């Protein structure tokens, strides 16, 4: 069922309003997993990753623009946000209700990056639970059907929030402590990539 939405103010935290699951893939794995836990963050290379380090999968751009949603899992790619464009650091990240991700670099102009893709199953109770809120497809669940957020039958996204059932108090505390440490550290250090990413996604 739909959990209440808790505001986190981190742009890469995504809540699903409606049906569907995010699609994740571990770098070392060929089979994707599925989750409703949208507690994501950008790594130092700009990859959008889940709390278990898996890549968040999305629809690749076509000639630099948003293209159609792939129908097969093979058509998805890990979402990667370019942290600089022509040597200018990213100044803003937007994740829209329909899954499209855009980034701006010092000006008002937003560039397409990728689009989050969701999976739907005819029988959710047939999914195999893997722990940590992630699931895998089985014969009982049926094959995944891919769609874009806000498509008919698919959830829309809310950036800057998490579904209450997916908010783990310890995770939230860890994230807050981390942010505090980075803030203290950055007062002394030159700003590194990871701090830049951290700051932008808040």
Predicted regions: what is each one?
Residues 1-61, 68, 74, 81-202:
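Amphipathic alpha-helical polymerization modules
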């Amino acid at each position: 069922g739909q959990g209440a939405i808790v505001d986190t103010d981190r742009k890469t935290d995504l809540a699903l309003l409606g049906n569907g699951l995010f699609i994740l893939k571990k770098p070392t794995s060929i089979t994707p997993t599925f989750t409703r836990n949208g507690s994501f963050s950008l790594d130092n290379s700009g990859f959008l990753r889940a709390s278990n380090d898996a890549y968040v999968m999305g629809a690749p751009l076509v000639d630099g623009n948003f293209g159609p949603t792939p129908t097969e899992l093979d058509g998805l790619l890990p979402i990667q946000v370019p942290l600089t464009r022509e040597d200018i650091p990213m100044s803003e990240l937007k994740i829209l209700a329909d899954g499209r991700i855009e980034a701006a670099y010092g000006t008002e102009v937003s560039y397409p990056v990728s689009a989050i893709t969701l999976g739907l199953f005819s029988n959710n109770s047939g999914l195999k639970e893997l722990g940590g809120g992630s699931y895998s497809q089985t014969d009982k669940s049926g094959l995944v059907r891919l769609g874009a957020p806000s498509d008919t039958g698919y959830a829309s996204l809310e950036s800057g929030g998490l579904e209450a059932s997916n908010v783990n108090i310890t995770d939230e505390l860890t994230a807050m402590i981390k942010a505090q440490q980075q803030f203290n550290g950055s007062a002394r250090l030159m700003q590194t990539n990871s701090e830049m990413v951290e700051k932008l996604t808040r």
